[in-house]
């Protein structure tokens, strides 16, 4: 607990992100990763391998932008740093491990940025409703971006803002995911997407109890490799059930088969 509290206090975090609970969530993930390291290992390696395949898809290798690089457990940073002239690790909060890794690599830069580009407006009530959420724009005009990686964030974008708005007014937010998908399609370089599709609730005997969409009504319109992530093994959240995510990895959306 002392280490968690210290990590929370010393990790740089914009005020809006701290208000929404991003620092607290980052510390929680660090702790859960420590407890569930073995269960998470296949998912993390699968994610890294998808990014490695995306690197091979990029004909030019000037700049890579990684969206959702806050902890880096699922990121083959050494491969990216070796392959590209510059690596931009984009997130609202960057954990101690990824900060140290960036410091060790001269061509790796941390970029503190809200990838939805709407959190401030949502929290301050400047958006009438989810349908008025602005489309993200950052990095779109940069011709040197040869690879974009959306790293296990598509299902997470509405989570903390949605919780905040539900606490404030009973509202719900899910449009961030759809806006993020549209944003990715506007890049001219290779775009790699890794993200949760479904959340499965399993009984203690392993039987499936319920399957829930992880995307809050949005969809990922591309086919790719899928696998299961044992995000909360039996006993992690409750002694009577486990939680497992179905994840998709798409090295290049332009080369992937589109799905309805």
Regions found by a protein language model. Give the residues of each.
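Conserved SAM-binding motif I beta-strand of class I
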Residues: 85-91, 112
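S-adenosyl-L-methionine
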Residues: 101-142
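Conserved SAM-binding loop of SAM-dependent methyltransferases across substrates and taxa
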Residues: 70-84
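Class I SAM-dependent methyltransferase Rossmann-like catalytic core
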Residues: 2-61
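Conserved beta-strand signature within the Rossmann-like core of class I S-adenosyl-L-methionine
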Residues: 147-150, 176-183, 188-196
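Charged, low-complexity C-terminal accessory regions
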Residues: 196-260
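Conserved class I S-adenosyl-L-methionine
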Residues: 60-72
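A short SAM/SAH-binding and catalytic strip from SAM-dependent methyltransferases
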Residues: 130-166
């Amino acid at each position: 607990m002392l280490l968690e509290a210290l990590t929370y206090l010393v990790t740089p975090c914009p005020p809006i992100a701290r208000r929404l609970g991003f620092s607290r969530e980052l510390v929680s993930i660090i702790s859960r990763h420590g407890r569930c390291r073995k269960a998470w290992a296949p998912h993390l390696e699968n994610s890294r391998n998808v990014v490695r395949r995306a690197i091979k898809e990029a004909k030019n290798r000037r700049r890579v932008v990684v969206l959702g690089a806050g902890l880096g457990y699922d990121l083959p940073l050494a491969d990216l740093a070796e392959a590209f002239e510059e690596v931009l690790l984009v997130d609202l909060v960057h954990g101690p491990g990824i900060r140290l890794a960036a410091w060790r690599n001269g061509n790796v830069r941390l970029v503190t940025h809200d990838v939805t580009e709407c959190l401030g407006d949502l929290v301050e009530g400047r958006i009438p409703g989810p349908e008025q959420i602005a489309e993200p724009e950052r990095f779109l005009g940069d011709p040197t971006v040869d690879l974009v990686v959306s790293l296990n964030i598509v299902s997470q974008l509405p989570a903390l803002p949605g919780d905040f708005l539900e606490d404030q007014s009973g509202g719900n937010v899910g449009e961030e995911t759809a806006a993020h998908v549209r944003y990715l399609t506007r890049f001219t370089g290779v775009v790699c997407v890794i993200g949760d599709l479904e959340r499965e609730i399993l009984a203690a005997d392993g039987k499936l109890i319920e399957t829930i969409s992880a995307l809050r009504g949005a969809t990922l319109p591309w086919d790719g490799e899928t696998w299961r992530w044992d995000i909360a093994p039996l006993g992690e959240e409750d002694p009577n059930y486990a939680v497992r995510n179905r994840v998709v990895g798409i090295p290049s959306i332009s080369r992937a088969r589109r799905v309805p």
